[in-house]
UniProtKB/Swiss-Prot annotation:
Name of this chain's protein: Basic phospholipase A2 CB1
Primary location recorded for the protein, binned into one broad class: secreted
Key words, A-Z: Calcium, Disulfide bond, Hydrolase, Lipid degradation, Lipid metabolism, Metal-binding, Neurotoxin, Presynaptic neurotoxin, Secreted, Toxin
Organism per entry: Crotalus basiliscus
Presence of the UniProt keyword Secreted in the record: yes
Tissues in which the UniProt entry reports expression: Expressed by the venom gland.
Taxonomic classification: Eukaryota, Metazoa, Chordata, Craniata, Vertebrata
Length: 23
C-alpha cells in the first residue's frame, strides 16, 4: 500500500505546513 501512503503524505503535506510523517 505504498502508493496509498504516498497519497496520504501529499494530502497531509498540503493540509499542514509540517507533514505528519516528519515526526
Amino acid at each position: 500500500h505504498l502508493l496509498q501512503f504516498n497519497k496520504m503524505i501529499k494530502f497531509e503535506t498540503r493540509k499542514n505546513a509540517i507533514p505528519f510523517y516528519a515526526f
